[in-house]
C-alpha cells in the first residue's frame, strides 16, 4: 500500500551528496514531494528530509541503497506520526482585495496565520502548520479568488526521540572504520 514516508539522512556536508541521493529516487521512479536540506546540530553534518509516497517494500530498499553512499552517516525512514512535522507557507494577496474583503481578515484569524508584509500592491500572509492545514487555507483563499501567489517550505521535522547520541556514535564508528582500512579523509586530500 502506498503511503507517505519521510526519509531523514545525516550526511557529511560535501559537494554532490544531494545529486547522489536524488538519483536513487529517480532510479526507483519515486516522486519527491518535499525536500529540505539544512545544517544539523553537529557542525559539518547536513540533515536531509525527503518526503515521498511509496510502498514500505520500496522505501526499505531505497534506505538500504542510501546507506551505501559514502557520505551518508545515518539514514532512517518514518511515518508522519513518528515525527513532529511542520511546514511554512507564504500567501500573497492583492492589497485592494485585502482592504475590500473582510474575508481575508477572517481567514487569517481562523487559520492562526499572520501578516508579515503589507504595502500598496500586496499583503503577504505567513502560515506555519501541518501540510493539511496549509493546503486547506490555500484552498479557501483560492475558492474566494483571493490568492495571487503561493509558496511553501519543505517539511521541517524533529524526532520525538533524541537522535544526536546515535548520530554521534555512527559518525565516530564511520571515522574509526575509515582510519582502520586506510581511507584518507577529505581534509588530508586537500593538503
Which residues does each predicted region cover?
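Long, contiguous binding/interaction regions
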Residues: 1-47, 53-191
